[in-house]
Amino acid sequence: MPVIESTKTFHPTVSPSATETPLQSTKDVDDEFTRLIDSLTRRGFLSGAAALGALGALSACSSESSGTEASDEWVDIVVADQTYRLPRDPKRVVVLEARGALDFALLAEYPIVATNWDPKSQLMQKVPAGAARLGGTNNEPNAESILSYDPDLLVVGKGWWDYYQDKGLLGTDIAPVLVVDEGTTGSSWKQAMTAQLTALDRREVAERVIARYNAELARARAKIGGLLEGKSIAIAGADSGQIWLQNNTFAVSVAQDLGLNVLTDAAHAAPDRKDSTFYSLEELAIFDQADFVLLQNPDAVEAESPTWKRVRAVQDGHVGHLRYDLNNGLALTAMALAADIAEQVQVMR
């Protein structure tokens, strides 16, 4: 298969210059995950994993000691400097949001008894038969509904957990809480996922996840073939009178794992928002450097603007739809996104 040799970073006010980076093969991605796992195993998972098995069993919903140590039953992990004590092998897991949390719970092969539900998410088809739809919403979790499933573990993404804590909506008094870390930047999801699976004594699960992701990348690469050889793609979005270009994000990392040249412009991003760069509808020249655009919100009014319609890839009909449920997540979502990108670039034929 023809190889795309580099991922280029372009800037709208200067001539593009290529910075060559070798294509990541399936073996490269596999080696990257292996290095992560081995490193995490040697060093432990932040400060908390060094203490795995060293503390007695304390229920997260009780401040009293059981009086006996049961280290085989519990595991300690650290997320954002907070330590959480969790059951090593939970029996009744409730998932509070249907994106990163559900992705992780499915990857970890947890016995899910109930989950928040998003009918538009590709993850729903992977939910085990018999799992119930959790009452309440992401914004307003329903404690009564959660309790009705008698959970021994709650799973929630870090962003939502922070929101619940800020609003005083949910605590650890119902059951122990696994706060899913999706990475400090969108492109660090692999390291965060591998770290948590390893910390939870699920290294073998992490290895299976790696193999599945590599296999999906290989299938997607084969389908893309030489369609994008020597070409670039942009991962973008439209809203609020602007078009934005993704830089250091989940979707960009998956495209790069596919070996694609991805147009980015971190140099012109706001200092506090380096993951994407935003442009007014009058300054869209950078997008002419892309041969294909994967666009979030393609039905937005901004996508109907005359300046956007003059972008080269738009004129050529080389625009795909970045679905909301594929824009962020962990390995299951990454696999679905890789397959979706391979399908959508077929318009280049």
Where are each of the predicted segments found?
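N-terminal secretory signal peptides
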Residues: 1-40, 51-57
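Proline-aspartate-enriched helix->loop->beta-strand connector
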Residues: 150-156, 289-290
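Extracytoplasmic substrate-binding proteins
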Residues: 169-239, 334-349
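Bacterial lipoprotein signal-peptidase II cleavage site
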Residues: 61-70
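Basic- and aromatic-lined ligand-binding clefts that recognize polyanionic substrates
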Residues: 92-108, 205-265
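N-terminal export leaders
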Residues: 41-47
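A short, structured surface patch at a secondary-structure boundary
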Residues: 92-94, 98-145, 153, 158
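Structured C-terminal subdomain patch of bacterial secreted/periplasmic proteins
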Residues: 287-349
